[in-house]
Amino acid sequence: MWSRRFAVAGAVLLGAVLVAPPGAAAAPTVPSPAALAAAAPAGLIPDRPSPEDVRRALVRVERASHGKVRLGVVGRTNEQRPIRLATVGTGSTRLLYMTQQHGDEPLGTPAAVRALWALGVPDSAWHRWLRSRVTIDIVVQANPDGAVRNQRYNHDPSASGDYSEPGVGYDINRFHNPITPIEDNPVPESRAILRYWHATHPAIVVDYHMQGRYLQPDGRETTASILWPTSPLAGPAAVDRSRQLAVRNYDAMTYVAGANVTRYPGGDYEGIARNAYGILGSASLLVELSDLPQEQTAFQIRTAFVSMIATAQGAADGSLWRVNGDRADSIPARGPSLPDTPALRRADAA
């Protein structure tokens, strides 16, 4: 449930970004974060959904939206499962979100399905305005073969070499390298996302993952971490926009969702989606949700939901590009692993 403090803060923050620039027509009043979150019906999708759960939920969203949410497939896995795409909006600014590249990191997926309902089913003036300004593509559960096995990797018994578990599969999030010819990429999930990027050239890419549990220097537990491209191959303009995107998400996740957000200690390898799509020119961001106890699952899903909505709003009215990206340097470091949580430790390098 949204506390009154966060509901008020969220209304102020999300309303402020919808103020039109001088000379532009005023945007319609934004619904409160609580109202947006409550739009999706209870039981729309489980917290840790199977591929079949995802299919059923997306079909339900599409039908309820009367065509405003459009469904598709960007590719198929080695087991011929569809890599599902859902799209809302018709605007000229394109956004690409992806969830669950690692099959055992599920919470971005229910957040995405609920965001699709919240943005695509209601038909207020604000909803029509937003959909006219942005097109949001979401690769929902990018690794369905891994999801059915609750494993990080895709399914490929022939996998070998770097960034693989031999006999198990490949780490999808190491195979977005924009320098490697797509036809030489051994990972069908990564190939599909790369091809879709080249077909649409999104201005913004946000990749949703999960991580272990960590303590900030002040003793609070990190509930989410974020990071922009750090590869030296990413151009300065893309990095600057990515840092603005990071600050926008930090503010929304902190002051609207109530998350404790830190800076993810990621590497600079160009095959990581965060880096790859920055190299290609998008504003690119990694969002990591901490693997908290079950009673905090709804909170974590809400954090990702807020990130998705805030990014869409900032892109729709352009306020995202007026954010001071230098503030990204003040996002606190993630901190050390939380002790005595062996069941939640994971190889979580995104």
Segments the model singles out, each with a brief description of its role:
Residues 7, 29-50, 185, 189-192, ...:
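C-terminal accessory segments enriched in acidic
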Residues 74-76, 88, 98-101, 139-144, ...:
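Active-site-proximal beta-strand/loop segments in catalytic clefts of secreted hydrolases
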